[in-house]
């Protein structure tokens, strides 16, 4: 419980969604009610299922959500349990269930797996990699994501990192993914060191792309020139992938 309190830093204050974005409610397998924002575009578009970082809530990246939607993507951004208007309390197994519930809600609405991109930032990237290991999807895109929580703790706390255990281990899952993956990382990231992003990329065995966000830190990475365009281009390629296997 103490470790969860250190890892998860939720904010319960969520404003009304911006124009063009609607609210959704999603219920998880263990009956937790989650709050989500959804931006839709007409036509058979790729859909990003967005898992955010460990702090704040979905409102913190509203500008990025709108920028991705403006590039022709459907975006479902949900809050983990305990974040924003979502019920419950966050813990590792719980946020994995939350991601699965968000994904499943899109499938029930008729979105095929071949148009779903598991998308995550920081801790949410680990959640997205886990999601892609238990649900079929078209592609995975992660930004500022670490190899494991212990590796992040080792960078900040040295020998004391042993108390973290094996929470949020992306390396354990990424090696087995079979879909294309996009990894972006700021080379001045002061929270999740750049080399962890490089290690995560090296561990991926499938088709992959690495985007080095030059001069970007952890919290300003989406301002890196070309990053949002690169994510959108990578996501739209899922449509071509789906067409090629028909």
Put a short name on every predicted segment:
Residues 187-192, 218-219:
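Acidic catalytic loop of the alpha/beta-hydrolase fold
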Residues 224-246:
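Catalytic active-site module of serine/aspartate enzymes centered on a nucleophile-bearing elbow/loop
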Residues 177-178, 183-185, 189:
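Short beta-strand/loop motif that positions the catalytic acidic residue
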Residues 105-109, 114-158, 173:
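Primarily recognizes the serine-hydrolase "nucleophile elbow" in alpha/beta-hydrolase
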Residues 29, 33-105, 126:
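Membrane-embedded segments
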